[in-house]
Each structure stands twice: as C-alpha cells, then as structure tokens.
C-alpha cells in the first residue's frame, strides 16, 4: 500500500493528465457518434421524402437529359418546363380529372384526334387509365417530343404484368399545350403548283410518329375529267426529300372515286404518306407518276399498260 501511495504522489500530475486525455477522447467519440446519428437520420428522412414525392407525382421518372434520337443534351430549364406540363397532364388522368386533362390539349389535337371530351374519355382515358393510377417514365425523343411509357402502378393494383405497359408520344407546343396519342404537330404549308391547267395546293400537313397526312386541294381547269392516280400501284405517289429518298402513299386508304375530278371542278383530298418521324427530314416535292389527263380517253384504251401517264410534280 505504501509503495502505491508513493507512486501516486510522485506521478500525480501525469496520472491526472492521462485521466483528462481519456475523458477528452471519450467526449469526442460521444460527439462524433451523436453527429453521425443525426446525419444518418437526415439521410433517412430525405429518402422517405423523396419516396413520398415520387408517389405524389405518380412515380414519374425522367430517364435522361439527352435526346433518344440525336443524343444531344436538353437544356435543364426546357426539360423542367416540358416535364412539368406532362406531369400535370398525367396527374389529371391519374386523378380521373378528364376535363382538365382535355383542356391541356391543343386545338389541333382535339380537332384531329378527339373532337369532343367524350371522345377523349372513351378513346384515350378509358384505354390507358380507366380509373386506375399509373406510373410512367419520361424520355426526350427529339426536340419537343417525349416518349412516355405508362405502366400499371404496383402500389395501386398489387400486381405488375408485362402487357400492362403502354407507350405514347407527347409533344409540347409553344403555349404549353400538348399533342398526344402520337400526334406530333400541324404544319401550315399553303403552297400551290400549276401545270396543264391543273392546280394542286398543299394546305397543311398533320404529322404523326409513323406517318403524315397531307391535306390538298385540286382545281381542274381543263375541259376533261382527270384522274389523279390509278390507285393500282403502291409506289405511284410519293414524297421526295432533298436526298432523293422516297416516302410512298397509303393507296389502300384512297378510293378511285375520290381521285376523279370533273372538268372545272375543285375537290379536297387527304393523302397519307409513310414516315418514321424525323425532325430534320426535308421534303421538297410530292410526285404523282400516274396522272391521267383525259379519263374518258383512258377508259377507251384497251391496253392500259401502253397508256402515256402524266407525271405531276407538286413543289413544297
């Protein structure tokens, strides 16, 4: 005991110093542990908030900030503005608010796809939503057009099947309105070409993801009935671009009677052409290679293979 007291008296300062160091280290460790727990709790809270936000925005996910076609980056401000309006539309649909969803559509989209709100409800809303909530992903396709993949919400339905995923293409128009159901846009053209006393005017083009519809007016100022096309050849009418690429018409959607134009008559016609939507495609003309300038004469021709068809080029 005496030796222990003697050791303590001789090393009292050192012992106190060691004790203070141990206490200091202990306090530091406690503080570090405390702040680590706070940081971890904050991360958990942020994660929960992110999940909640995702659920409130219908589980929407932006795939990338780059165009799927060109690979070019999209400006963050544009991306936010565009996805906000798409999210708004999807939110209306998820909540069964058909009226407000319909009001986000452009007038052109309404006219071409859904003339009435009932048409929109029956054709689009009931087909994709039908009272159910949906999850979806958004990916820029090209410029103002976005690919939206719509999937049954597993949290709402309790199941997820492969055949429950649908894809739509939604295009943002300048006034923050939408073209949906793969309808891209309307292009006003108003270009006319006259030849052989026949005038063809291209009024406008309705552009879809897989095809285009040209609205044209034909004025026949001749003394004979003309036939725009014999409609027996899938390649007799086509669009020609600056690289001499041809895009052929859907001849099965036209009937011969619509292609007949009496003398001094004017008629309106819509012709559908093949097209996988590309923003930079430059169409220069529409070509009719089997136009008949005198239909009565053509009818009397026994060997129609020898008939001298006229090629009419409409400049665009």
Feature-to-residue mapping (PLM):
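Hydrophobic pocket/interface hotspot
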Residues: 89, 100-102, 216
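Short, low-complexity N-terminal intrinsically disordered segments enriched in polar/charged residues
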Residues: 34-91, 95
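Short solvent-exposed beta->alpha transition segments
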Residues: 84, 98-147, 236-239, 243-249
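Short structured motifs
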Residues: 133-135, 198-204, 252-257
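Exposed beta-sheet edge and beta->alpha loop/turn motif
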Residues: 11-15, 26, 30, 41, ...
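Short, hydrophobic/aromatic beta-strand segments
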Residues: 224-233, 249-250, 283
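Asparagine-centered strand-capping/turn motif at beta-strand->loop junctions
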Residues: 217-223
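N-terminal Lys/Arg-rich, disordered targeting/topogenic segments
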Residues: 1-15
